[in-house]
Amino acid sequence: RVRASSGRVAGSGRSLDAGRTQHKFDYLRSLGIALFPQDGSGIQPGMTLVTSAAVEESVPDVVSANELGLERLTRPQFLAKLLNQPQPTLAVGGTSGKSTVTGMIGWILHACHRQPTVMNGAVMKNFVTPSAPFASAVVGDPELFVSEVDESDGSIALYRPEIAMLTNISLDHKEMAELRSLFGAFLLRARKAVVNLDDPETRAIADVVPADKCVGYGFDSPGARFMGKNLELMADGSAFTVIAGDESQDVQLSVAGRHNASNALGAIAAACALGVSLEEAAGALARFEGLRRRLETIGTAAGVTVIDDFAHNPDKIDATLATLRAQPGRLLIMFQPHGYGPLAKMGDELAQSFAEGLAADDRLYLPDPVYQGGTVERSRGSDW
């Protein structure tokens, strides 16, 4: 978005120096974004340094920025500057489902010719084109901004959107008590809160949100403003009816799983909060293609279907396994933990999810956790 607004953008990264994912860096260069080694040489006076949570103080670019006295922002602080504007903004939070919901809302608005700006954590297939192969962000009208927001580092406390959406709350990067506090404050800061009432944790938080600003949705929650009924799950999608007041619309999805039906119901509620009609929102989702690495079928050979999925916490794994279990065949699961830190926090719960979700003839393979460098404690690995 900054580059599209005529701002100058440059950057570095460990992956660039290591020669990984060169096609992604080539794409950035094609947008006019300058790239340089992460050795401090690219840092110049007048720059603002924006860093992700993984960038440590010892990184040469950070050292150079400090020596030059440059303004420094974390990625969430920079996103908050864009999101906390007096304009229609919608932020999607929650432990699971926020990337999919953000993609669904973005697509609904686009299909209704609203031209949103969308910031997501995954590639949205509907927006992929030859000139934009990595469509995890869409630059549109700066006056309509939809973004996924993350709670893993506590930075969700920075955001003050017009509309805050909460999908669910479960164990992930932080303890439950802290998550309840972070998400509750997130909803209360917004003018309107869109909340999944089927999730016990989010429902409890919704009870403290003023009734006139809370928009509830759910399949099993009487009193929800957006109610899902007649849910039919199929191998390649689902169908249900959404009821909102005196209106009702049938919804057809081509992404599988009960969790995605819930995601779609929430996306409809959020889009309607932005002024989209129920009919338009439901109709647009029939053409939603999904996200990369979210139960994405890579191909089939010799009777074996290969599926790529990003599930990395107990809740996500439960949903993925439940969706796969509903289809015939044995499961051969290769699961790489999302990092040494998350494995240390959730190892027992992850083991329980697999123990309960896999059948006797299924197989689970565990390589070492993801590690891209840094000083994280690595004494416990996948041999847990």
Question: What spans do the regions from the language model cover?
Answer:
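Short acidic low-complexity segments
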Residues: 34-45
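Conserved RecA-like helicase motor-core motifs
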Residues: 10-15, 113-120, 217
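ATP-dependent carboxylate-amine ligase
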Residues: 1-20, 26-34, 49, 67-70, ...
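Phosphate-binding loop of NTP-binding sites
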Residues: 29, 43, 53-197, 201-213, ...
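Short active-site oxyanion
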Residues: 7-10, 46-48, 143-144, 189-193, ...
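Structural motif
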Residues: 12-16, 47-48, 51-54, 75, 163, 192, 195-198, 219, ...
